[in-house]
C-alpha cells in the first residue's frame, strides 16, 4: 500500500485513490525522475525507460511496482543482474558493447574521466568479462562478472 500512495503522491491529479476501475494512468517520466529515490541516480532515465511499458519512461502503477520490487534489497541476484544488464544496454540490442560501456562509465564517473580514460576502462572490462571474446558482453558474460562483484547486491537498490 505504501508504494501505491508513493505513486499517487507523484501525480495526485492523475492517479485516483480508487483503482477499482483499473485506469490506464501513466505518471510522466519528469515526475518519476524527480523522485528523491532517483533524482541523483545517473541512470534514472534508463531505469525509467527499462521499467516503463513503452520504453518512454512514463510508468503505470504496475511498472512502478515492478521497478521497486526489482530494486529492493530482497530481490534475487539473478533478477537484479538481468535488469542491470538491460539498464546498461543503452542501444537495446541485448548485448553490452563498447559504446554501452562508454555510456555507463561516463555516467558512473559523472563525466570526470577523459575520453582516453573511459576507453581504457571499457577495454579492461571487455578483456576481463567477455567470455567468448566477441567484443561485447552477453547477459551470461555480465552475470558471470556480477558474481565476482560482492557489493553488487548492496549497491543495486532503491530505498523507499
From Swiss-Prot:
Could you tell me which residue ranges the EF-hand domain spans?
39-74, 76-111, 117-152
Q: Which Pfam families does the entry link to?
A: EF-hand_7
| GO MF annotation terms | calcium ion binding; magnesium ion binding
Name of the protein in its database record: Calcium and integrin-binding family member 3
- For the keyword Calcium, the answer is yes
Q: Which amino acid positions bind Ca(2+) 1, per UniProt?
A: 89, 91, 93, 95, 100
Gene designation: Cib3
Q: InterPro entries, per this entry? A: CIBP (IPR051433), EF-hand-dom_pair (IPR011992), EF_Hand_1_Ca_BS (IPR018247), EF_hand_dom (IPR002048)
User: Note on file?
Assistant: The binding of either calcium or magnesium significantly increases the structural stability of the protein in comparison to apo-CIB (calcium- and magnesium-free form).
Q: What does this protein do?
A: Acts as an auxiliary subunit of the sensory mechanoelectrical transduction (MET) channel in hair cells. Plays a role in regulating hair cell MET channel localization and function.
- Which organism does this sequence originate in? Mus musculus
Q: What SUPFAM superfamilies does this protein's entry cite?
A: EF-hand
